[in-house]
Amino acid sequence: MKVNSTTEIIKSLLECLSKEISNGEDEDTMITDITELFNLSKEFDVRKEISNKHNEFLNILMNYIIKSTTANGDNNEKLFKFNLTSIRFLRNLCANVSENQNIIISNSNFINFIINQLINENNNIKITLNKKNILTSLYQLLINGIVLNDKTQSLLWSNIYPNNLIILIEKYKDNDEFKLLPTNLMLIYNCILNSKDRMKDLVCNKRLVQLIIELIKEDDTFDHEYNTQNFHWIHLISKSLFINDLFIDLYKSLSDNKYSTELVKSTTESTTESTTTESTDSTTDSTTTTTTGKTNKNQVKLLNLLDSIIHDGDKKNIKEYIEKDSIIDLKTCYFMIDELASLYNLDFARKDLKVETQQLTTSLNQSDFDAIFFFIKIFANITSYTEEMLSLSLSIFKPNQIPTKQQEGEEDPVNQILNDPFSKDSAIDPSASKKFDLNTLLRKKGLVAICIGSLHGNYGSDTNKSSSSSSSSSSSTTTDGETVTSKGFNKNIESQDKGFKIELIRILGNLSYKNRGNQDEIRELGGIEIILNHCRFDVNNPYIKEWSVFAIRNLCEDNVENQNLIESLKVKGVANNDELKDLGLEVGVTENGTIKFKNVPKKEKENNQ
């Protein structure tokens, strides 16, 4: 019965639409008919029947909307009401019926009409509820027309990317009285969903990605609900890009300058050259004028998004090892270490300045320091293995066993991958993840040296001591033959978040858990001594003691060399015996003067957090 009534209503409506000039009575009939169709379209069977029998009617209706709007604008209230209801009717027809989606989105004249309406809406016209409703309905029609339909997604994307999308965001980003930006972001999300090509299109357009990330407001107290809606869709867009291995491209696209690591390489070279007998004036000038840093606020926002997805979404696995519950791959991990190292080197290039000048200046900006903090937080989470990652690591890679030395003349296969940190995109051998567990690869890439270098810098409860510590640096060779230059950053990141040093120690604790190679390198780079120095209560950083105890316990597990080092530090008065007991360790001296090292009962805690 409903199908018959639908057919009769459409027939009646077509008679009115076919008249070149309509009178008031015709307009009333049209409104009645389209309202009935709108109500009927809420049922799937009706939507399906219309797609099978009334294709031509849909095209006639769309053409009428274009013609009447162009001729009358908003002056005819009845036609305006008819058009609004027609748009809502078309919107409903698209729900779960791909045939209707194809008919509507394939009508290029109608799609261009919608886009022009959204872009050219006169902001000088008094805002009315009707105007808001019709613009919102147009957006909803576009979204319903592309949901789960790759064909219509491609058609619409070709019409709106990139210029129209940029115009739409720029139009409303500073004055969105209609609250349309969240719907705009929803449209972008549905366009790129399940299409890596369209995701790449989005990421490659620098202006577009900047506009999207800029919509994340640091202070959303003015309109919390509106900003929350924007953030929700930006979060979903970003997550889709991360899952499809586009974090690196997105991060580079957000850069203020042409992205390259050559800047870091050249500053390192100039620093080396300054040790010669030639004048260092030019080197000094180049470093002191580098005040703009490397990172910007949009990149920091992106890192914050990645950190929240990994931490709050519990996406700590790495794709090459376990794809389930993963958001990034090994290449992204390496890229983030390269970014950390480049920021270190950028600031380290100032070593030829006077100590007093180093204390008062920096080559890094505030966003650089914020980026450092988020990189460290991310590594603190991904080095904390999930149960699946831990089981895989111990059963396949066995990092808890004493590493065997490479045969003489045989190069470490990972060094073959990592020996040129300035190679384009730090190309990664896919087989690396089949030879070593994640935490071993991160150590070989230099993460241990970076963390210990930071702890040797000017952070922590003793940051107000002699300024000589602020210029301290260390150049060490890892157990894998790589030379890593590291230096503590000049700026005290703990002024923003006292958890920075905790995250560094947490990383070292995670890396050393049941991993003999990592345990040894931390000892060789002086990490044990500095971690022991934090095994005491710090009123300015109350949880650092617990994390330091956690790290020392993991460092000493099945590692006699590390245990012996702590014994020797106890004799020198460096280690606190009470703190060692918290670790389940006790150091004493026998009657003949030899050191006695034994285990004592300790509280059970999780080994890897």
Curated annotation (Swiss-Prot):
Q: Name one Pfam family in it.
A: Atx10homo_assoc
- Lipid biosynthesis as a keyword of this entry, yes or no, is no
Q: Where is this region: Disordered?
A: 265-293, 405-426, 461-490
Where does the record place Low complexity bias? Answer: 266-292, 466-479
Spell out where the chain crosses the membrane. none
Q: Where is the composition biased (Polar residues)?
A: 480-490
Cellular component aspect of the GO annotation: cytoplasm; cytosol
Q: Which InterPro entries match?
A: ARM-like, ARM-type_fold, Ataxin-10/CTR86_families, Ataxin-10_domain
Q: What are the protein's UniProt keywords? A: Cell cycle, Cell division
Q: Name one GO biological process term.
A: regulation of cytokinesis
Q: Which SUPFAM superfamilies match?
A: ARM repeat
Free-text function comment from the UniProt entry:
May play a role in the regulation of cytokinesis.
Family as reported in the entry's similarity comment:
Belongs to the ATXN10 family.
Q: What protein name applies here?
A: Ataxin-10 homolog
